[in-house]
């Protein structure tokens, strides 16, 4: 017997943000560590090039992707990790995903203001 009004879940959009964050972290963070942690301090990449890239529309898009999506992945892991440890935070989904949404809005306006 099928239900006439199935309950909608918020999991698909949250899992989308979680998986995007994990994928972007795995692909981009090693490159960022190489550029910002090794090549920049050694003087092999000029700071002016990084700043110029950050001021382009593509650079801003990269900064947004590298900062927003991993936050969603991290908050999703914290939320489900606490649940797995039987620590039930009141309205945990609203708190963790709400903080991620607030962070996303703040980062969006900060990057646009670059």
Curated annotation (Swiss-Prot):
This is Fumarate reductase subunit D. It comes from the Bacteria. Its main location: membrane. The chain crosses the membrane at residues 27-47, 50-70, 94-114. GO terms for cellular component: fumarate reductase complex; plasma membrane. Part of an enzyme complex containing four subunits: a flavoprotein (FrdA), an iron-sulfur protein (FrdB), and two hydrophobic anchor proteins (FrdC and FrdD). One of its GO terms (molecular function) is succinate dehydrogenase activity. It holds the Pfam family Fumarate_red_D. GO terms for biological process: fumarate metabolic process. It comes from Actinobacillus pleuropneumoniae serotype 5b (strain L20). SUPFAM superfamilies: Fumarate reductase respiratory complex transmembrane subunits (SSF81343). It is a multi-pass membrane protein. Keywords: Cell inner membrane, Cell membrane, Membrane, Transmembrane, Transmembrane helix. HAMAP family: Fumarate_red_D (MF_00709). InterPro entries: Fumarate_red_D (IPR003418), SQR/QFR_C/D (IPR034804). Anchors the catalytic components of the fumarate reductase complex to the cell membrane, binds quinones. Belongs to the FrdD family. It is found in: Cell inner membrane. Signal peptide: none annotated.
């Amino acid at each position: 017997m099928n239900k006439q009004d199935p309950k909608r879940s918020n999991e698909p959009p949250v899992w989308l943000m979680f998986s995007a964050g994990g994928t972007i972290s795995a692909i981009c963070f090693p490159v960022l560590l190489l550029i910002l942690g090794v090549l920049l301090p050694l003087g092999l990449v000029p700071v002016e090039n990084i700043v110029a890239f950050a001021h382009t529309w593509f650079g801003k898009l990269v900064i947004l992707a590298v900062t927003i999506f991993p936050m969603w992945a991290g908050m999703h892991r914290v939320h489900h990790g606490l649940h797995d440890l039987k620590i039930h935070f009141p309205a945990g989904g609203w708190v963790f995903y709400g903080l991620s949404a607030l962070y996303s809005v703040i980062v969006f306006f900060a990057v646009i203001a670059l």
